[in-house]
Amino acid sequence: MGFTIGGIRELGSGSRRRDRAAGSTFVAEYTGRWGWAVRPGARARTGTCSCGDRRCDAPGAHPLESAREVPAGASPDVAACAWADVPGASMMLPVGRAFDILEVAEAAGRRALVRLERMGLPLGPVAVTPDGRAQFFVAPGAAAQLPELLYRMGWDDAPLDLRALGPGTHITAPPCDLGGLGPVRWLRPPAPGTAAAPPPARLLLGTLAYSCHRT
């Protein structure tokens, strides 16, 4: 079944009604079960952005300014009511509250994830984007701490394809479309205990940096 969440697929009116219900279900899961706020996001349509700005520099990959955020902890009824006002919107997760993001190339992220799992380290969710990025959910504060952490680990001078996302940024939530390129997917889905309290960046950073260096 296709989802109109994020403009993944446009179907008939009956399917759109079902997909709107599916959209609010995802929102309710993210807000109620995992403790994340959700913002309605724009979607890409035939090379343009649903925000209406013909010069939009991030079509289908940014929050809708006029749409209200669904707060963390919102009930299914609140989520359904909020999402009924933004049919077809994608789901955007605000970074810097419940989590920050360490982002690397997908190939490096997949290698690092295998190693981290073998080491038995605590891990939060990991998403992969259609443009080949892996996003590791880590404790808030990672974006501010990243330069110092890399320095302490001896990676500050290495040319690494690694960046941190923090307050003021958003990521597209699975299974929404990202900029018309395809859906974002879970490489490691949210789980109780780590979704709302992901591990500190320092536990993952050394392995991620090493994997990036090898790429």
Task: Give the ranges of each region predicted by the language model.
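Catalytic core of tubulin tyrosine ligase-like
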Residues: F136
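DNA replication initiation modules
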Residues: G141-T215
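Signature for HUH/AEP ssDNA processing cores
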Residues: G2-D131, G141, P192-T215
